Amino acid sequence: MESTFFSLGNRVKGSSFKSSSGLTGEPGVEEVYLTIDTDEKASFADELNSLYSTYLKTAEQYSLSEDTLVFSRFYIADIANQKTVLRESEIFGILKNSAVSIIQQCPAFGGDVSLLVYHIKHDGHAFRKEVFNCDTENRRNGAIIHGNNYDLLWTANFYGIGPFDPYKQTTEIFKSFNTILTMKGMTLLDSAIRTWVYVRDIDNHYKGMVQARKDFFEEHGLTPDTRYIASTGIEGFSREVHSLVAFDAYAVKNLTDGQIVRMEALDNLPPTIRYGVTFERGTRVRFGDRSHLHISGTASIDKNGEVMHLSNVKKQTERSIENVEALLSPHGAALQNLAYLIVYVRNIKDRTKVMDVLKDKMPSDIPILLLEGAVCRPAWLVELEGIAIIDDSNDFPPFF
């Protein structure tokens, strides 16, 4: 795997992963992740203009385009007051040409908006892409990317609707997601790989989301004996104040037995079902030329499921990194293989302490976004997530 990390000024960091060839001898596809920050001294409109020009410059320099665009997510400080300006901006006008998510999780440094973008390149050839919307205001949206061997489905901005009840809103969201899977010839058990579940006032509403997800999974064959889905459950806010849950997801069509692998590190973290939660610590997806290692939201936990280092955000950050390393290691992967890292901090005043640890413990070239987001237990002060990409060689068709 040819991996490259790059930066453009002090606001853009990126990673690129490309295999030399698949089993057919054809050149492998290239995956590119970008993180872009803004200047806190600018107005929100000016931040968006800056984001637009910075993204265009980066895209031009690294041969990215709307044809290679797969998924993006805006992290903003105040969705209630900034959503309209964002949706009318030039940068949104570009990124809505694939799956695009907007969530309120205030960037810890810089301005009011940060951006994560994912592109796939295949020797300059455009892939076939279907962008779809699931409501009249074009907010619930998604894209299916058609490859030679697999179809990649991304859904975004599935905000909670209905009664002011996290259980009912979560159930409706998963039903809607499952309907899309069915329409695209997929199933939850065979195809769903990764979810992000954002919960408003997580200290009060997480339990209802967890129970709804557990019940839905049991109905669709996701159990401790089969598998769950890699996931992050974190505080975040969608557009409506009465919307308690928001949801992004990723699924892959045409996977076969053996391609989805449960990631565990039992000396560090117990299975989540031990304390009634239904997600994988991590999920490896094996392709013929590479593996994707999806790391779920990972906090300062011990092998018995207890919080470690109460009230010490630096020690919690260190333990979270250790746990990520423990999940990666059995698969021949390390922190350096991460395409990006997202870090959530409960108290934004802890941002410098957390960043000091990240600078000390993480490879310096990994793109990192540090965001405000309370974790599912009040005692957890910080949480990490990301994806690693490594070489693989097997009889499965190569990626994409």
Task: Walk through the language-model features, giving the residues of each.
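N-terminal presequence-like segments and the immediate start of the first folded domain
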Residues: 1-339, 345-400
